[in-house]
Amino acid sequence: MAVLQVLHIPDERLRIVAEPVKEVNAEIQRIVDDMFDTMYAEEGIGLAATQVDIHKRIIVIDVSENREERLVLINPELLEQSGETGIEEGCLSIPEQRALVPRAEKVKIRALDRDGKSFELEADDLLAICIQHEMDHLVGKLFIDYLSPLKQQRIRQKVEKLDRMRTRA
């Protein structure tokens, strides 16, 4: 297992559209395991492969408090969505920044699990929001893309300043 480097804005690799996984094999399972290690090390609740410079349609999520409810979504497809909600979202690729983002309240998706088995999942609340957030990453979209240009610029400047401070430390 390994902790991978998480890309931060303004890194353009975050805008690359992920490719479908052709076969779930040992390499894909290793990527999934490394992504969980990375997500937990960074204290996140979700991570898309794009965020660790792997441009495959892979997402890992764990919104549980005890960190024991791992959800793997390989090649996820949105089947249905309904309702409206929104919370202040954060993102490991946009450290220490949050903003209110409009999302569907409920979603139904189809995906492959860590073993390559197809399944469908209906989600609501935080899990539904997290799924939508991570699926956005797979198409090169970030939560700040939902914000006004002024708010986007302010967040970019704050993240760049944080990265400069971390580099000096």
From Swiss-Prot:
Active site: 134
A biological process term (GO) from this entry: translation
UniProt-listed InterPro entries: Peptide_deformylase, Peptide_deformylase_sf
Entry EC number(s): 3.5.1.88
Function: Removes the formyl group from the N-terminal Met of newly synthesized proteins. Requires at least a dipeptide for an efficient rate of reaction. N-terminal L-methionine is a prerequisite for activity but the enzyme has broad specificity at other positions.
Matches recorded under PANTHER family: PEPTIDE DEFORMYLASE (PTHR10458:SF21)
Name of the molecule in the record: Peptide deformylase
Originating organism: Enterobacter sp. (strain 638)
The encoding gene: def
